[in-house]
Amino acid sequence: EITTRLVGSEMCIRDSSILSVKRIVEAVDEPVIVVVSALGGITDKLINTSRMAAAGDASYENEFREIVYRHVEMIKEVIPAGEAQVALQRQIGELLNELKDIFQGIYLIKDLSQKTSDTIVSYGERLSSIIVAQLTGAEWFDSRKFIKTEKKHSKHVLDTELTNSLVRETFSSLPKRVLVPGFISTDKMTGEVTNLGRGGSDYTAAIIAAALDADSLEIWTDVDGFMTADPRVISRAYTINELSYVEATELCNFGAKVVYPPTIYPVCHKNIPILVKNTFNPEGVGTVIKREVSDPQSKAIKGISSINDTSLILSL
């Protein structure tokens, strides 16, 4: 049996929670593939830094220094002083130097192509995944080698058949604990870095889970699962224990930003249950998403979500 765990949507992996991530990963006895996202806020900082550089704003260097600081301090916080920490700092430093050179190039030519932008944002997951791999003792695998996209109508979309084949080949002999950067992919023809879209780490985990017929997909984020309503609006909102794939998809499409909507299709097709849990409250029940729901407390209205000027009431 294989469990695929997405540890943290991008907003979840914060400096304060990374040791919680370690405990979550180490709690699994069976083989586990862990997919991680960038440290919280780093993807936005990467995008902002690149735009500042392209606009000729020299203060992009200050923004970049914050990115460097976050990762360097993270390593000092979670990896004990010694040879392992020094080696990791060197490895992360090399990636950060690559990134620095890219930003300097953008600043000099005052241009930011989509290709360069895709390369830049990939560093968020590459950096965080290497740190978490060291922290958890997991074997690091480069998702750029097996998550493949193709260009259709000027957009990069997943090549499912090729990706499934490469995932099965890559993990034909599965180590006890595997660490994979989410979100990142490459063009199957050119090898250029692409990505699966914001929230794509969820999708990466689902793709791998489906390709390997995993026993389950766990998504560890910063909420207790799907709620009956937005708790910031409805104070009495509570966690929904079970949802069907269809119900979860509808809620996600109408504003419930718990799971990236494309995540659900690959595992739905294979009838692999999704468990959504809170990194900061691992003892919480969370929400199970599966084909058939057997919630004895089912009510006429399961949950309410909304987007601007639009609302969805989900009835049974």
Where would I find each of the regions flagged by the language model?
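Single conserved hydrophobic/aromatic residue that forms the stacking wall/gate
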Residues: 1-8
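Preference for bulky hydrophobic residues occupying beta-strand positions
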Residues: 182, 274, 313-315
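Nucleotide/pyrophosphate-binding catalytic subdomain
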Residues: 8-264
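A conserved regulatory-domain signal marking ACT and ACT-like small-molecule sensing domains
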Residues: 285-316
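Sterically constrained small-residue positions within well-ordered secondary structures
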Residues: 2, 189, 304-306
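Conserved dinucleotide-binding and phosphotransfer motif residues
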Residues: 270
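Internal nucleotide-binding/catalytic subdomain
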Residues: 216-218, 273-276, 281
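Acidic-aromatic/histidine active-site loop/patch
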Residues: 267
